[in-house]
């Protein structure tokens, strides 16, 4: 994984290497699904070293590693869920119930992809292309592009996961669900309980806990959360944009843990939902941007008001100390203000308990 996915990224940052080396590294083809089957094998090897692996039949292991439906976009498979299914004889017997259920799930995923995701792309792609080309992006265009990509990504990603689950079910093999209506989340902790759930599980079990989890004090716990999400961002792609996206989510996970937010909210709160959705949308912008420059142009357009723009800070001639003071003041207000905000915000009177479902 390091050679195929990250070597070009690392080589590109070394200024003294010959251009031929850089070109050769960037020309290495990336095998389909390498990120997913690498994670499945890491989990198997770690658990084997811990003595937690019960199923070791080479044929079942081979099926587990090479099982193809999930390789494009997940879910991330775990041997404890998959290998026992390959060991059961009934898995290989055709069942019309599995074929019917699998076909229905597959069609739902296909419709999400073709009808929703693909129709969001024309509203998102041109805006990011305009920002990349150096064109003027208005605030309205930037927000439309950011929101369109937010829905495009979810419906595209969850569609592929649904199709993988459905196709696998046709074969009589059950894959874990990967999404649970993530845009219903009322905080970032809740979001990561709903978004790419199998990846969240892997990062928790094989990275966060390995770093120490919450066993060494609060500060270490927050640092472990941040590092876990930082590396989780890097897993998505070899680009600084993914790293910063991971850092963005890691920062908010740490802040929310420090604020003591409800990790399993049972009631829907529209104010908390709106704030969480805003954080998610802001994060998706840098996730989608080709580079930091494009992300900066998008953010500059999104957070411009009338004739005033973020770029006008350049003409304010602020000193480094003044900028640092503003940053510290903002973070202080954000930390202490958000703590009171979350503690005092009341659910809407008509709100009903949030129903956890599998509607994707």
Q: Residue ranges of each PLM-predicted region?
A:
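Membrane-embedded transmembrane alpha-helical bundles that form the catalytic cores
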Residues: 1-329, 333, 337-360
